[in-house]
Amino acid sequence: MTTANCGAHDELDFKLVFGEDGAPTPVSQVSRPADLEPDDCASIYIFNVDPPPSTLNSSLGLPHHGLLQSHSSVLSPSFQLQGFKNYEGTDDISESKYSSLSGPKPFECPSIQITSISPNCHQETDAHEDDLHVNDPEREYLERPSRDHLYLPLEPSYRESSLSPSPASSVSSRSWFSDASSCESLSHIYDDVDSELNEAAARFTLGSPLTSPGGSPGGCPGEESWHQQYGPGHSLSPRQSPCHSPRSSITDENWLSPRPASGPSSRPTSPCGKRRHSSAEVCYAGSLSPHHSPVPSPGHSPRGSVTEDTWLTAPVHTGSGLSPAPFPFQYCVETDIPLKTRKTSDDQAAILPGKLEVCSDDQGSLSPSRETSVDDGLGSQYPLKKDSSGDQFLSVPSPFTWSKPKPGHTPIFRTSSLPPLDWPLPTHFGQCELKIEVQPKTHHRAHYETEGSRGAVKASTGGHPVVKLLGYSEKPINLQMFIGTADDRYLRPHAFYQVHRITGKTVATASQEIIIASTKVLEIPLLPENNMSASIDCAGILKLRNSDIELRKGETDIGRKNTRVRLVFRVHIPQPSGKVLSLQIASIPVECSQRSAQELPHIEKYSINSCSVNGGHEMIVTGSNFLPESKIIFLEKGQDGRPHWEAEGKIIREKCQGGHIVLEVPPYHNPAVTSAVQVHFYLCNGKRKKSQSQRFTYTPVLMKQEQREDTDLSSVPSLPVPHSAQTQRPSSDTGHPHDSALSAPRSLICPVQPAYASMITSTHLPQLQCRDEGAGKEQHIIPSSVMHQPFQVTPTSPMGSSYQSIQTNMYNGPTCLPMNPASSQEFDPVLFQQDAALSNLVNLGCQPLSPIPFHSSNSDATGHLLAHSPHSVQTPPHLQSMGYHCSSAGQRSLSSPVAAQVTGQPSSHLQPITYCPSHPGSATAASPAASHALSSSPISGPPSPQLQSMPYQSPSSGTASSPSPVTRMHSGQHSTQAQSTGQGGLSVPSSLVCHSLCDPASFPPGGAAVSIKPEPEDQEPNFATIGLQDITLDDVNEIIGRDMSQITVSQGPEVIRDAPLPGPESPDVMSSNSAQ
């Protein structure tokens, strides 16, 4: 294809090149506009050969591409092919002649189309041959496909996208091959280009190319239509030699040089304009690469080197500009792809519908292949390969789900469908329990497959771990063991470590390995003669290879630092039904890395595991590998496993020493939580040196429970507090509405608040326990929460008219009535309203109320008080108790008094307050049952005045009611404003609301807790004008104080504790009656 250097008027005769001597044959030339230079259109010369081989006919210049029918007229066949003339210092462009297909073709030669034409490889053309004649305009040059054209593809390893310039070492800003493609790009694979290039080189005398300064600012025929159809990105390309191979033309000097960027309409760096790409320039899809390559990559890059959205989202051209002739190459589906290349997207071919992957049977090197647009007709003939190689990629694993699986049902399974290894199972069920009697050591160095065994896992106390099954010893069963995870997520088989069977003379336990879901499981027999126990001296830990780790799906998000494991043991116990009971237990975390065991901190124990959301508590953490710069981080994770709250505990450095760290628990980020919140904390010595996370619980300080109409009290969960208030719903067939828990004419307040102030200094909750003898059972439900608010109690004087109203949230009706002996109203028996739980009390340094014993008798039975203040609590001081008993009409109730036990300095001389109303016709008598001592608050202070007993009898006609004494004790400072040392005058009312309901069947099945709200102290309601709903316990206390002011009985605490119960003829009762 090259010619010798000729003079200005010498012709380029190719007869010498091909050894032909035929006479020139008339050729037809394609007409073109006069303003267009032929050099712009004739950059590649295609030789069509047909016998007889006489002479070289002409050189054809295919504008744009061979299949585009852009010429509608042919030139006169009276011109022969003229050689290129060498013009120095001129910009005239030589003309090329177009041969017509009408004449015989004496010789055909395959054309070699490589890439855009280099300005250094062009020959000068003769510009003086301009006699063009139009002949046969309706005949087009491309009536039939040119079977002689070779389209040689690039091979996948031709160049790197980031290093190589254009494929033929072009300095152009664009090449036919997109820069978005990498060396693994799926490209056109054809026949071996080496043999073709060698064959072509043997036919031609390759000479030194000369640079043509010729150029034209204008375009070739069809340029504007080309721009309109295919966009400007394909119209401009620098000149490049058609004789250069992609393999041979890249030199050391230019293969790393970056190509200058140019816009779609920029001119080339050649001084004389830009030569058109012509037949080597073809169209795939009309999309542009990030570097404006006219020919983007035919397939997506497995490495995801696409850098611009326009390369992926450019419109796909149809085949309207293509000839209907078939393509002279074939497509194939299979290409070579690196087997371990990672694919960074699921289906990039799906977003590249216009990219065709064209290949041949033999894989060869690259040559610019013809771009093709896909239409419906061509798509079936040349199938579109979307992602046929997707299966050969190693897909990136999807993120591991952090959601915990639901167990579903009881751990009883069929033998044919045993639970998977990641299924959560309990440690005990029924009478069977699986337990680890001896835990393994916290460190065991795992071994690789390529090294020798490091022995079995050992125990911290020496020997090996011991596992025992309790509750079953009928026949031997297999104990399954595998290596599980030890992170914050639910237990599952570990991805990096497997159990390894240890054998040898020193191994006493038989075992065998099985594979369950690609996890090694060691089966160890549990024998009845060994008491269903086994020493695990046959199990080691095997570390998988890193490649195996990477291949395991779902574990790449953890990383290779997950070196802690647990030994998981599982048994399947046969059941009489033919099924099996599956139990599972996991050991403590075991560190498998030697380096991690030496560097990572380890928390062995900590002093407290819960505190209020306000924080501030001191916690002592004990462990190993603690450093002076160690930090303790509290965090809370969401359902996805990602932390959404972190806080650092304040370490008290002066108290830390060695393996002990003392810190202050940080407050929780949401102090308004209404239930306990579980968080985690860990100790870290650096960015990646963290200990295992430990659990910690924040408890709420304020929980206000309003009225809930459809909530049963028995379904309300208890709070995680040291003491819980316990009450019982009375058995009733019909529920009482909450909004009418008190009937206005039949309600009464059971007075508990004395006329003297009391300070409360503990933070425990009260206990309330009731027993329903008719139901014959005892229930403990719903604790009373504690309010984090101070309250002040002002004692009422006998003649004072000051009232403090403590409002309750659950009553819409009247809450109390004045208990005046002179009142003419008749009051029904007072029954305790169990649905009204204790009001929220003060948690800021408050003392818990002691249990409120209550006995409700629905049948003739002897009742006794059930609630006792626990004496084994950490904070012994409690508030006082109230013993109360009532009965319904026609029943006999025996109530026992509650004597308050003085547990500090002697404070007050108390007298029992006895009260036992009954219905008309009912006979009640006090029973001298054994009194239950309840500890009271030993608050230091001067003795408070004695509380005299006040027997009260319901003024109903024909009734004989005897009092049931209730003793109260208050030890505190007697002052108008009750104060305590270190409390600053904070106090709470020790009043409990009791409700009188005539019919036990009218009790509601569920109730709501009572929230006590602080009342302004300057409010003094007028007793004569307020309604029943505004009467509070203080009003009743004033009435009690007036009654008690008339009683002058004085007894000591010892007398109260040892004195017999007052009977119907007791002097106390008589004095009370006389006072009434």
Curated annotation (Swiss-Prot):
Its main location: cytoplasm. Residues 206-307, 359-390, 700-744, 863-987, 1049-1076 are annotated as: Disordered. GO terms for cellular component: cytoplasm; cytosol; nucleus; transcription regulator complex. Pfam families: RHD_dimer (PF16179), RHD_DNA_bind (PF00554). The modification Phosphoserine is found at S345, S373, S1066. The keyword Ion transport does not apply. Induction: Induced by lipopolysaccharides. NFATC proteins bind to DNA as monomers. Member of the multicomponent NFATC transcription complex that consists of at least two components, a pre-existing cytoplasmic component NFATC2 and an inducible nuclear component NFATC1. Other members such as NFATC4, or members of the activating protein-1 family, MAF, GATA4 and Cbp/p300 can also bind the complex. Component of a promoter-binding complex composed of STAT3, NFATC3 and NFATC4; complex formation is enhanced by calcineurin. Interacts with TRIM17; this interaction prevents NFATC3 nuclear localization. PANTHER family: NFAT (PTHR12533), NUCLEAR FACTOR OF ACTIVATED T-CELLS, CYTOPLASMIC 3 (PTHR12533:SF6). This is Nuclear factor of activated T-cells, cytoplasmic 3. It comes from Rattus norvegicus (Rat).
